Amino acid sequence: MISPDAARNVVGIIGNVISFGLFLAPVPTFWRICKRKDVEEFKADPYLATLLNCMLWVFYGIPVVHPNSILVVTINGIGLLVEGTYLLIFFLYSPNKKRLRMCAVLGVELVFMLAVILGVLLGAHTHEKRSMIVGILCVFFGSIMYFSPLTIMGKVIKTKSVEYMPFFLSLVCFLNGVCWTAYALIRFDIYVTIPNGLGALFGAIQLILYACYYRTTPKKTKAAKDVEMPSVVVSGTGAAAAAGGGNTGGGSISVTVER
C-alpha cells in the first residue's frame, strides 16, 4: 500500500508539471506582440501580479522560512524567470506612459517585498511563525486573484458565447485546482487548500458555462482569439516528504481569457 507521503509526492509532481505548463499559456500573446512590435490593448497588470505572487512563494520556500520546500522554490523561481521575460518583452514594445506605470508598480512590489522580508526575518524568530505570516500573505493575494475569472464568466453569460473562454484552458485549470486540493487534503495544509479549492471551484463553473453556451457561440468571428492571462497564481507549501527528506510544493493557477 502506498504511503500518504508517497501519494502526496506524486500528486505534487503532477501539479508542478501542470503549473509549469500554465506558466507558458501567454506565449501566443507575446509571440503576437513581438511580431507586431506593439502591445496593443494588452495590459501588464496580470504579469506584475504573478511576479509578486512568485516572489512571495519563493520567500516562503527558502530554508529560513519553511525548510525542506525545494519544489516551492524551484517552480516559483521558474515562474519569476518566465514572468520577468514577459515583462521585459512588454516593456520593450510599450509606449512611454505604459513603461513608466510598469516601473512604478514594480518599484512598489519590490519595496513591499523588502518590507515583508525584513519584517518576517527580524520580527518572527521561529519557522512556524515565519511560514504562517508569509503563507497568509500568499493565500490572501492568491485568493484575490482567483476572483478575476468572474469577469469573463459574466461576459459568457451576457453574450451567450464562450469565444474568449477556451475549453482547454478551463479544463486544465480545473484539473490543476483539483490536483492541488487533493495534495493539500492528503495531509491537510490550509495554505494550499484555500487557493486551490477556489481554483477548482471556478474551473468547474467555467466548464459548466462552456457546456451551457458552446452551442450558441459563433463558429467564425473576425476577432483574433489571442490568449491573455489576467491571473496566474503559483502557490506552494512544503508538506510531503521527498527523497532525502525534502518536501514538495503546491501550485495553483487561474487562467482566464479576455478580449
UniProtKB/Swiss-Prot annotation:
<dbReference type="Pfam" id="PF03083">
    <property type="entry name" value="MtN3_slv"/>
</dbReference>
<feature type="transmembrane region" description="Helical; Name=4">
    <location>
        <begin position="104"/>
        <end position="124"/>
    </location>
</feature>
<keyword id="KW-0677">Repeat</keyword>
<keyword id="KW-0762">Sugar transport</keyword>
<feature type="transmembrane region" description="Helical; Name=3">
    <location>
        <begin position="70"/>
        <end position="90"/>
    </location>
</feature>
<feature type="topological domain" description="Cytoplasmic">
    <location>
        <begin position="91"/>
        <end position="103"/>
    </location>
</feature>
<dbReference type="InterPro" id="IPR004316">
    <property type="entry name" value="SWEET_rpt"/>
</dbReference>
<feature type="topological domain" description="Extracellular">
    <location>
        <begin position="125"/>
        <end position="131"/>
    </location>
</feature>
<feature type="domain" description="MtN3/slv 1">
    <location>
        <begin position="10"/>
        <end position="98"/>
    </location>
</feature>
<feature type="topological domain" description="Cytoplasmic">
    <location>
        <begin position="31"/>
        <end position="45"/>
    </location>
</feature>
<feature type="topological domain" description="Extracellular">
    <location>
        <begin position="1"/>
        <end position="9"/>
    </location>
</feature>
<feature type="transmembrane region" description="Helical; Name=6">
    <location>
        <begin position="166"/>
        <end position="186"/>
    </location>
</feature>
<feature type="topological domain" description="Cytoplasmic">
    <location>
        <begin position="211"/>
        <end position="259"/>
    </location>
</feature>
<feature type="transmembrane region" description="Helical; Name=1">
    <location>
        <begin position="10"/>
        <end position="30"/>
    </location>
</feature>
<keyword id="KW-0812">Transmembrane</keyword>
<dbReference type="GO" id="GO:0051119">
    <property type="term" value="F:sugar transmembrane transporter activity"/>
</dbReference>
<keyword id="KW-1133">Transmembrane helix</keyword>
<feature type="topological domain" description="Extracellular">
    <location>
        <begin position="67"/>
        <end position="69"/>
    </location>
</feature>
<protein>
    <recommendedName>
        <fullName>Bidirectional sugar transporter SWEET6a</fullName>
    </recommendedName>
</protein>
<feature type="topological domain" description="Cytoplasmic">
    <location>
        <begin position="153"/>
        <end position="165"/>
    </location>
</feature>
<feature type="transmembrane region" description="Helical; Name=2">
    <location>
        <begin position="46"/>
        <end position="66"/>
    </location>
</feature>
<dbReference type="GO" id="GO:0005886">
    <property type="term" value="C:plasma membrane"/>
</dbReference>
<keyword id="KW-0813">Transport</keyword>
<comment type="similarity">
    <text>Belongs to the SWEET sugar transporter family.</text>
</comment>
<feature type="transmembrane region" description="Helical; Name=7">
    <location>
        <begin position="190"/>
        <end position="210"/>
    </location>
</feature>
<feature type="transmembrane region" description="Helical; Name=5">
    <location>
        <begin position="132"/>
        <end position="152"/>
    </location>
</feature>
<feature type="topological domain" description="Extracellular">
    <location>
        <begin position="187"/>
        <end position="189"/>
    </location>
</feature>
<keyword id="KW-0472">Membrane</keyword>
<dbReference type="InterPro" id="IPR047664">
    <property type="entry name" value="SWEET"/>
</dbReference>
<keyword id="KW-1003">Cell membrane</keyword>
<feature type="domain" description="MtN3/slv 2">
    <location>
        <begin position="133"/>
        <end position="216"/>
    </location>
</feature>
<comment type="function">
    <text>Mediates both low-affinity uptake and efflux of sugar across the plasma membrane.</text>
</comment>
<comment type="subunit">
    <text>Forms homooligomers and/or heterooligomers.</text>
</comment>
